[in-house]
Amino acid sequence: MGRKRSISMYGCFLAFGLSWSVVLMTSLPGNTADLQTIRDRGFLSVAVHDDRFPLSFRDATGHWSGFEVEMAQTLALDLFGKRDAVKFIPVANSDRLRVVADGQVDLAIASITATPSRSRWVAFSSPYYFERSAIVVQNNLPQNRPSQNSLVRTIGDLRGQSVAVLKNSSAMDALMSQSLGLILVEVESYAEGWSKLRSGQVQALAGDRVMLLGAMRKDADLRLLRYEFGLYPMAIAMPKGAQYASFREKVQGVVDRWQRSGWLKEQWQRWNLDS
C-alpha cells in the first residue's frame, strides 16, 4: 500500500509541480524580511504546529520533531550551514496565513493546503506532500440513536450525528460541500477535537488522514472509517512582494532539490506518511 501511495503522490507532483510554481509564486506587497536580512539575522523564523504528530510536534521535554520540523531544519542548514538556526513559532490553524502576511515569521510550514484563494495573501512553494481527509471514530462508541446500538461503520451511519472538524481547514470546506447530513462542530485544535470525541460530545472527528493515523498508533480505541475525501497539495507559505523574490526563489530551489534527490520520499517513509 505504501508503494502505491508513493507512486500516486509522485504522479501528483508531476501534475501539479509546474502549475503551482508559476501560479502561486506571484508577488504583491508584504512586510517580511528579505533573504539578505534573514541571512544577516542568522536564523529562520518558521510558523509550525506543536501538536500535529507526525508532522510537527513537541515531546514531553519540549523537543521539536516531525516531518515539517525536519523540513525547516534542513532549510536552515542550507541557508546558514546549521540545522538549529531556526526559531519555531507555534501557530493556530486560523493564524497560519496571517503571521506570514503580517511579517511575524519568515514562512510557515504548517500543513497548509495551497489554494488560489489563499494565494491572495501569501505565496506558495510547489507541494511537498499531498494529503487527504478522513474521519475517525472511537472503536466501541455506538451511534447516539435511541433505536439502534450498533457501531458506526460507514459515513452513512454518521448522518444526523455530530462530527468535530478543525476551523478553517480543508476538511471543513470539503465536508460543507457534500450532502452527507452531518452536524459539523468547529474546533480550534485537534486537542479540542479529541477531547470532544472521547467525552462523547461528538461521534467522530474529521481531519488530515496522516494526523488521524498518527493518533491511532497511540490509541487502539480509535478507528478510521473507510471514507477518504479531498486531495490537498501541502506547501510552504511565504511572503508576497517583489522584494522577497530572492527568498522565495531560494526556498523553491531547495524544495525542487528535495524532490529530485528523493529526500522527500525518504522523509515520507521515515514518518510513515506513505502508508
Predicted region positions:
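Short, polar/charged alpha-helical segment
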Residues: 60-80
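Ligand-binding clefts/hinges and TM-proximal coupling segments of bilobed small-molecule sensing domains
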Residues: 170-185, 224-226, 255-275
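Short glycine-rich His-centered loop
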Residues: 42-67
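Periplasmic-binding protein-like
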Residues: 50, 130-142, 209, 213-256, ...
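Acidic, polar ligand-binding/catalytic clefts
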Residues: 73, 77, 81, 85-157, ...
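Beta->alpha turn/N-cap motifs
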Residues: 47-53, 89-94, 103-115, 138, ...
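A ligand-binding cleft/hinge motif common to bilobed small-molecule-binding domains
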Residues: 95, 111-121, 174-177, 191-231
